[in-house]
């Protein structure tokens, strides 16, 4: 599903109206119809006890006035509280105000010194419709509007927001001083970026997307470039298995991972890769740890690496790397590998950046090694998939975690484009970015997945999908969605508390099967 910025939505509206001949009143009518339908579907019983439309003077208010008229026609008791003078309304809003008044609909103008009047109207209603501001808000909400939003939130009545909760920055998802806490938001045309990511998700409530007739030619011209992943689009990416296939058809992965005290990261990544359908997996790790891996990973081959007295891996020669990479078709570097004092891990990563000619993933300590020499990334022979959590992302860009979380989409897109890599910025609503600047937002996953080892599992999943022939973009989309999808299945069955990384691994076969079944 496409996701847009406020500027992109304005341009889509403009092109649809001016170039492709759809009257603005027609778009407004369609918007109002969709909102009214959503209200009656979700809040039918409550609406019959009284609806108050709180409207501004612009086209968002106009949408609300269409809703008022349509509800009035269906004999739903409905009033309008107008946070403006009637003569100041936009032309389209004014037209729809007249339509409501022709049905003898009650309209109350609320002035800055008459906010108590709004309070009285709120107590007489059981459902509120927020039609104050649209997507264009950038400055803090003040005065009458801030007072109105505060009163609406404090009323205890469910609120339906028109397009975007008033007071919410539709792109960043942050409240502009104060914002409507909606129980449901009806996004018009397409959801806005701030509605599908945090913190905006905490204000939107249930998100309903309404088709209002934006011309497809306008969409092609604007090319929004951001999408919310959906199950129906992901299911087609699940690899299928031919009846006469063999293990060689599903990839041979090389996983370079593990160090003293961090063997679990390597184990989780290898197990996740196998459970995600990889045909063969070889783990390359410091030789002193080989007995641990040989015992715990019975389906995985091991390649003991030379190490120094500190049990850190020693750099391999070019010839040794060529032998190790022979007949492999995807690589994972980093889970639990540490940051070697002697520079061996950094040097190994730089060799891979210069020479590796297969799809690959850099995760965990691999990213910490990368942060020590980020300039090498732009010259990678094969663009890797990077999988940072916000702390690792902060180290990569030299900022703090708060700065990363304040603009996850912007930072992910800028980094992927500048460094010509694929990026998975993990967290609630994981952000996927491509070297071309495309963005994908993942809706799956839950707070139970905030536990150790989840990133190692995701890295193993991604590498397995690369090994089975998916390109980097498709592997990221399927892998990230699948990871959270299984987490949601586990949480639904046994709760979020106590959910561990191994639960995701154990759920991979059934999760893949469930996703694949959605194709039919």
Predicted segment positions?
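Small-residue (G/A/S/T)-rich helix-start motifs and N-terminal tracts that mark the onset
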Residues: 1-83, 90, 195-364, 368-385, ...
């Amino acid at each position: 599903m496409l996701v847009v910025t406020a500027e992109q939505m304005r341009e889509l509206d403009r092109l649809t109206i001016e170039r492709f001949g759809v009257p603005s009143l027609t778009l407004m009518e369609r918007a109002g119809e969709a909102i009214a339908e959503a209200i009656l579907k979700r809040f039918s019983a409550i609406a019959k006890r009284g609806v108050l439309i709180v409207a501004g003077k612009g086209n968002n208010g106009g949408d609300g006035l269409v809703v008022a008229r349509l509800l009035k026609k269906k004999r739903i008791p409905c009033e309008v509280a107008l946070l403006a003078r009637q003569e100041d309304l936009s032309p389209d809003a004014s037209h729809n105000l007249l339509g409501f008044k022709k049905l003898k609909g009650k309209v109350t103008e609320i002035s800055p010194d008459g906010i108590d009047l709004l309070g009285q109207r709120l107590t007489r209603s059981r459902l509120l419709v927020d039609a104050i501001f649209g997507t264009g808000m950038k400055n803090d909400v003040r005065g009458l509007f801030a007072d109105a939003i505060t009163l609406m939130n404090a009323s205890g009545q469910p609120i339906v927001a028109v397009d975007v909760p008033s007071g919410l920055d539709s792109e960043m998802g942050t409240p502009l001083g104060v914002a409507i806490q909606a129980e449901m938001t009806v996004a018009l045309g397409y959801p806005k970026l701030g509605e599908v990511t945090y913190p905006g998700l905490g204000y939107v409530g249930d998100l309903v997307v309404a088709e209002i007739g934006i011309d497809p030619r306008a969409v092609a011209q604007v090319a929004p470039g951001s999408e919310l992943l959906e199950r129906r689009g992901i299911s087609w990416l699940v690899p299928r298995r031919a009846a006469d296939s063999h293990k060689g058809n599903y990839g041979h992965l090389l996983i370079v991972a593990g160090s003293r005290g961090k063997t679990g990261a390597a184990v989780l990544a290898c197990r996740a890769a196998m459970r995600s359908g990889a045909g063969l997996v070889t783990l390359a790790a410091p030789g002193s740890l080989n007995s641990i891996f040989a015992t715990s990973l019975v389906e995985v081959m091991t390649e003991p690496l030379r190490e120094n007295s500190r049990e850190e891996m020693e750099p391999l020669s070019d010839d040794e790397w060529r032998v190790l990479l022979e007949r492999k078709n995807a690589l994972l570097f980093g889970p639990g590998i540490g940051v070697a004092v002697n520079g061996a891990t950094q040097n190994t990563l730089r060799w891979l950046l210069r020479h590796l000619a297969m799809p690959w993933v850099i995760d965990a300590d691999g990213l910490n090694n990368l942060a020590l020499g980020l300039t090498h990334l732009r010259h990678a022979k094969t663009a890797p998939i990077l999988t940072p959590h916000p702390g690792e992302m902060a180290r990569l860009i030299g900022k703090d975690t708060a700065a990363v979380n304040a603009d996850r989409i912007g930072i992910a897109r800028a980094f992927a484009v500048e460094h010509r890599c694929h990026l998975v910025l993990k967290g609630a609503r994981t952000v996927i970015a491509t070297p071309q600047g495309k963005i994908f937002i993942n809706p799956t996953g839950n707070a139970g997945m905030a536990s150790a080892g989840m990133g190692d599992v995701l890295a193993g999943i991604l590498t397995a999908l690369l090994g089975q022939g998916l390109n980097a973009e498709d592997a990221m989309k399927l892998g990230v969605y699948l990871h959270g999808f299984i987490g949601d299945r586990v949480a639904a069955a046994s709760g979020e508390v106590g959910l561990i990384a191994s639960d995701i691994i154990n759920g991979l076969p059934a999760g893949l099967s469930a996703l694949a079944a959605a194709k039919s």
